[in-house]
Amino acid sequence: LIRRLNTFELAIIAKPTKTFSELDKYFLDQYAMGGGHLMWFIDGVHAEMDSLSYGPDFLAYPTYFDLNITDLLFKYGVRVNTDLIQDVRCAGINDRRNVNPWVYFPLFGATNHPSVANLNAIKGEFSSSLDTLESTGIKKTALLQSSSNAKRVPAPHTVSLEALYNRPDPRSFNQRDLLSGVLLEGVFESAYANRIAPKTAGASLPQLKQSNPTSMAVFSDGDFIRNQVNLINPELPR
């Protein structure tokens, strides 16, 4: 499998919902150590708008730890937090009468990095925040950030339609530039550098303990990668 993975320049992990086995993690780690590029789109919290079809509120709860990839991303220099970003700069939702601001759909600003430069605001849906960690030899570049009027709310958290009709008080949104997308570049140390490879990994390829120069991007919203188009007005988020 590693040989097959190595034929691709990029692997995308898009909104996983099932636990990664140690073998899955090992293959991804060794793919990165071989110079492969990774894009992670990870939900820190389970929260879906469909849940409001069954009542006026629902409980958003942490799911990141269930994925069993905490150790991988920690080793590479990033942590997905089990919280939700609320932002005064947000997209709205239509209640059939008006379009009201929904603070759980932050509109993230793109930074000046060439991969995101000149993009309009990026709509998040129940996005979590990211923290970068100390990791030798890894350059970290912010890609997506909140506005200067944002805040983090820890999960479990009750998401209620009442928030749709209560105008946000900017004074309580006192956090800025909350990170939701980051680029990591450099020479990575394997998460298995000081661990034995899973028995089922086989021994057909040597275990790599350090990568060639490579990069990976981590986003704390599994829905970023969805191709949503507003057919009525393409300039507005759907």
What are the functions of these language-model segments?
Residues 1-238:
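Acidic, S/T/G-rich, low-cysteine, solvent-exposed domains in lumenal/extracellular/periplasmic regions
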